[in-house]
Regions:
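Short basic (Lys/Arg) and small-residue
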Residues: 164
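Generic structural signal for well-ordered alpha-helical scaffold segments
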Residues: 51-58, 140, 144-152, 172
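Active-site-proximal alpha-helix that buttresses catalytic centers in soluble enzyme cores
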Residues: 2-6, 10-87, 91
C-alpha cells in the first residue's frame, strides 16, 4: 500500500501555536496613515485596546512566551499583554513593520495623488517597494526567518507574537499556502487576534483571523 503524504512533519508532536496580535491604535491610526518603521507610542485608544486584548488572552489557554517587534507601538502593546500574563517580552527585530519609505505619515489617497504610478505598481506587485522603502517580498523574507526561528526554538509552545499588519498578513499567507499578493485582500484591525497552529515548518491550520470581539 502506498503511504499517503499529509504534509505534517511530525503528526504525533504537539503543534506550535502562534497567537498573532496586532498593536493598538496610534495617533496616525484614525486617519489610516501609513506608519512603517517610524516610532509611535500607543494613543489612549490604543492602550485601551491593548488592555482589552490582554484580558482576553489571559482568560484563555496558557501562553508560554511573548515575542514582539522592536517598534514602540508593538512593544507598548506587548508590555501590557505580558504584564497581564505574568511574562516578560522577547524582542525580535525581524517582526518590525514594512518600511514604507517616503510614504510614512501619508494616507493612501495622498499617496495616490503624489505618486500615482509608483502606488499603482506597488498595489499589484509585492516585489515593488515604495520610494525609499521596502517591498513586501523583502519583508516576507525576514518575517519568515523569524517564524522559522520561532518554530525551531519554541516547538510545542504557545507563543504570543505582537507585530504589525504586514508581518501578520505575511504569516497568514504562509500558513494558508497562498501567494504573497493575497496580502492585498486581507484586512486586519487594530489589536486584532489571529491564531495559527503549526505542525512542523510548513503545514499549518489557521484558527481565526481579525478577531476583535474583545474590543468595546
Amino acid at each position: 500500500m502506498t503511504a499517503v503524504t499529509t504534509g505534517w512533519d511530525n503528526p504525533d508532536a504537539d503543534p506550535t501555536t502562534t497567537i498573532l496580535l496586532r498593536h493598538g491604535d496610534t495617533r496616525l491610526s484614525p486617519e489610516h496613515r501609513f506608519s512603517g518603521q517610524c516610532e509611535l507610542p500607543l494613543s489612549a485608544s490604543g492602550i485601551r485596546q491593548a488592555k482589552a486584548a490582554a484580558r482576553r488572552l489571559a482568560a484563555g489557554p496558557p501562553i508560554d512566551v511573548v515575542v514582539s517587534s522592536p517598534l514602540q507601538r508593538a512593544v507598548d502593546t506587548a508590555a501590557i499583554a505580558a504584564a497581564e500574563l505574568g511574562l516578560t517580552t522577547v524582542i525580535d527585530d525581524d517582526l518590525r513593520e514594512t518600511d514604507f519609505g517616503d510614504w510614512d505619515g501619508f494616507t493612501l489617497a495622498e499617496i495616490q495623488h503624489g505618486w500615482p504610478s509608483d502606488v499603482a505598481r506597488w498595489q499589484r506587485d509585492p516585489q515593488q517597494p515604495p520610494p525609499g522603502g521596502e517591498s513586501f517580498a523583502d519583508t516576507a523574507q525576514r518575517v519568515n526567518q523569524a517564524c522559522d526561528r520561532l518554530l525551531r526554538d519554541r516547538s510545542g509552545q504557545t507563543v504570543l507574537v505582537v507585530s504589525h499588519i504586514s508581518p501578520i498578513k505575511i504569516l497568514l499567507c504562509r500558513a494558508l499556502g497562498v501567494p504573497l499578493d493575497t496580502i492585498y485582500r486581507l484586512y486586519l484591525g487594530s489589536a486584532c487576534i489571529n491564531k495559527i497552529q503549526w505542525h512542523g515548518r510548513e503545514f499549518a491550520a489557521v484558527h481565526c483571523v481579525n478577531d476583535t470581539s474583545h474590543l468595546p
